[in-house]
Amino acid sequence: MATLLRSLALFKRNKDKPPITSGSGGAIRGIKHIIIVPIPGDSSITTRSRLLDRLVRLIGNPDVSGPKLTGALIGILSLFVESPGQLIQRITDDPDVSIRLLEVVQSDQSQSGLTFASRGTNMEDEADQYFSHDDPISSDQSRFGWFENKEISDIEVQDPEGFNMILGTILAQIWVLLAKAVTAPDTAADSELRRWIKYTQQRRVVGEFRLERKWLDVVRNRIAEDLSLRRFMVALILDIKRTPGNKPRIAEMICDIDTYIVEAGLASFILTIKFGIETMYPALGLHEFAGELSTLESLMNLYQQMGETAPYMVILENSIQNKFSAGSYPLLWSYAMGVGVELENSMGGLNFGRSYFDPAYFRLGQEMVRRSAGKVSSTLASELGITAEDARLVSEIAMHTTEDKISRAVGPRQAQVSFLHGDQSENELPRLGGKEDRRVKQSRGEARESYRETGPSRASDARAAHLPTGTPPDTDTAPESSQDPQDSRRSADALLRLQAMAGISEEQGSDTDTPTVHNDRNLLD
């Protein structure tokens, strides 16, 4: 049996191991297409700001082709470094594209104010054609859908600090798009707006340079459909992380945005580890979880073997991402989601509409959290040096805290209450029919007389005698009644008092034509 278990563990490890690269065959290269990336040909701030202005206009032009749009975005993304050309050549290793760099310098003879650097060749016409300044109609289209503030005509500046603020504002809006461009583009607008508000409050961006929605939609769609652009952005993030010492302010902002980008599309895997394993509830000892726990262990080892690109496997369209989907461990994932819903309020908005979702194990996770509330782990307590007295104190405090949390989040348990609408009277309500209606009225009258003559204790017995013998007990209240008869008697007495009071109010109001009606809308207001 021990040999079988060792073979099983070895089989699981080899099954999820990535293929080993061998030197027998050459690298597979695809059919490449050329991407032209304009970069500044000098260190002048005027050149960079003018190039940034032209590229933003170019991206806003709806007639721009896909490769040209990718080249413009790569040019903007690399503008914050001192040598954009060296950066692009160092980090670019894409089998699908061939990047050609074009140095751009200032020119007074071109309509765009820029020209391509060349040795004795006039390139103003080519520069105007690239930046779409050869046609006035195209120029007007490029201006449409630019910044939300229509008073901004251009973003050409000569101050390095001002240029960095404008460039950082534009780059922040582009980088935020990468977080959900692949995984959830339909719901990305809300999260992108929250990031924008955050960086505006931190004074990292300038609110006046908020780009228009359709400009951002164009960039988001291009990021979603172009793998080469995403490869460049991920390579740039990793290159910034490897940089030692202090980084430029824009680079630090990119690293901050990376916290929203990293592990995109891996929520099922990460949350299963967080809520299913790290919580260490005893439910992990179930036999049903044994195989899936072994699968998760193999996936965690595989994640580490992939190295620094593992958190970006979904963004990079790595085929190995399918192994990390929740379909590989459905029971443990369903259990972890139940734990997460009880522990964190933010988990309540997750979509569990999967074909492999198991409601039974989801409820198991919820019950484990509810019944384990206030309990202290003996293993962790011994490691931290927590005494038994301290553990009891912590359990007592945690129980009260959990009760307060439940009361605030869910509210008190209430019976179902029906209200009358303002346009209805008692006569207009649906009746039970002849015999049933008379039986109910007779029961109410006898209950009122019994309450007046014998008091609450005998009235409850009288009401019990009038109950139908074939009525099944309420599943929610039957266990409580069997456990505590005194509480059941008090509840019955309270119900009889309410019915008696209702009967008295009916007799007092019989002389009036219009009965008092309670409207649920008025109560809610």
Swiss-Prot record:
The keyword Ribonucleoprotein is assigned to this record: yes
Region named Ncore: 1-400, 1-403
Basic and acidic residues: compositionally biased ranges: 433-452
The entry's keywords: Capsid protein, Helical capsid protein, Host cytoplasm, Host nucleus, Host-virus interaction, Phosphoprotein, Ribonucleoprotein, RNA-binding, Viral nucleoprotein, Virion
UniProt keyword Transferase, yes or no: no
Residues spanned by motif Nuclear export signal: 425-440
A GO cellular component annotation in the UniProt record: helical viral capsid
Region (Interaction with the phosphoprotein), start-end ranges: 477-505
GO molecular function: RNA binding; structural molecule activity
Segments for region (Homomultimerization): 1-36, 373-391
Domains: entry comment: Ncore is globular and carries regions required for N self-assembly and RNA-binding. Ntail is an intrinsically disordered monomeric domain in the C-terminus.
Name of the molecule in the record: Nucleoprotein
